[in-house]
Amino acid sequence: MAKIQIKSEKLTPFGGIFSIMEQFDSTLSSVIDSTLGLRCSSFGYQYSEIVRSLMSIYFCGGSCIEDVTTHLMNHLSLHPTLRTCSSDTILRAIKELTQGNISYTSDTGKNYDFNTADTLNTLLLNCMFASGQLKEGEMYDVDFDHQFIETEKYDAKPTYKKFLGYRPGVAVIDDLIVGIENSDGNTNVRFHQKDTLKRFFERFEQNGLTINRFRADCVMSTTLPPQSFTVLPLRTARPLRCSMSAGLHGISR
């Protein structure tokens, strides 16, 4: 005869997320709070708890931030020690971490907004080192390009791709994003690209990221003269090589 046991524990179809939440907490929570600072001294949620809650939404199949309140809270709150915050708290924290835009004026008098997101870009690198995805002392190849992101937000501008959106510059190592700097969708890709790259490479150097080669699309050859590559870090394990992709007229050092 089969034995039937009555269990009093609560069951959840999302229990698999708990081990990921615990790994996140042990690996990244201290890095997040030390980089962003403490959000509260007593009651309330720290930034690490908010980022973990945001991560859990998408790991559990959610499609928007509000899903944590409407669908997931009853399940995620079953964890005995790790707290999950509401969608309102997540949205407030995102607004708190927003950095103001930098406005540049072109020769024709038009203004274009850039958002450097310095603190969040620093956090991105810190988390990659803490999680072992990047390692100090290793040499890395950095690729840079611009992306066009379609959006219907109030500040979206018309792009040359015939839709409204943003035009972030993105730096990657293999498949890891190591820097993002947003700008208006109607900004020419050449416009103040040198300043974007300077900020990226200064941040890489400050965080101990050793660059072997740098690659970018062909617009670099007409945007930056060779002397502009002094923005690249020189304190590397061996002489820095700036390797440009085809069509860059052999700019190297």
Predicted regions span which residues?
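Basic side chains
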Residues: 52, 167, 213-215
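Dynamic "connector" segments at or just before major functional cores
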Residues: 1-163, 170-188, 193-207
